[in-house]
């Protein structure tokens, strides 16, 4: 009788051990980068900023852009940054920006931020775009700037017109 009781207790203990290791969390793991391709990495001394889009490139016209900030020391992606950006076109005699949205975090627990930029002009041999990204993490301010490729699009993707109020619209 003792032998059978020991076997039964051992079996129950093993069953409880396996049962307690199971997970009731049936929510699927979300891949933040699904359908996105990396465009470029912009670096400074502390972080690497990864730019993404659906096509993996920027072009003249409307561009929906996502980004992630990676800490160079820990290798972790930042989840609590406040991000702003400023695209600048450097021409022979002047510099100008273009229409852009704010940069917003996509999900509370995620690492991806997104916004859009409408490049009104394409780059050429002497004129180019750069993207300055200003961001704050836990009260500390950081900046990273890099030249970006903005070739002409195959089709017209942006147009401007003057409204009845004499304001120009894109």
Q: Which stretches of residues belong to each language-model region?
A:
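Bacterial Sec-dependent N-terminal signal peptides
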Residues: 2-44
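First exposed extracellular module after export/assembly in secreted or surface-exposed proteins
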Residues: 32-170
């Amino acid at each position: 009788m003792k032998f059978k009781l020991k076997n039964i207790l051992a079996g129950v203990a093993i069953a409880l051990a396996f049962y307690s290791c199971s997970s009731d969390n049936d929510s699927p793991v979300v891949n933040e980068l699904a359908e996105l391709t990396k465009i470029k990495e912009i670096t400074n001394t502390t972080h690497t900023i990864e730019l993404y889009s659906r096509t993996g490139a920027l072009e003249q016209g409307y561009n929906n852009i996502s980004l992630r900030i990676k800490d160079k020391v820990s290798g972790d992606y930042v989840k609590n940054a406040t991000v702003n950006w400023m695209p600048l076109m450097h021409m022979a005699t002047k510099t100008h920006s273009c229409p852009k949205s704010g940069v917003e975090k996509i999900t509370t627990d995620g690492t991806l931020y997104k916004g859009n930029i409408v490049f009104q002009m394409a780059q050429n041999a002497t004129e180019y775009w750069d993207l300055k990204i200003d961001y704050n993490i836990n009260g500390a301010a950081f900046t990273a700037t890099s030249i970006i490729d903005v070739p002409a699009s195959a089709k017209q993707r942006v147009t401007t017109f003057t409204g009845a109020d004499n304001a120009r619209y894109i």
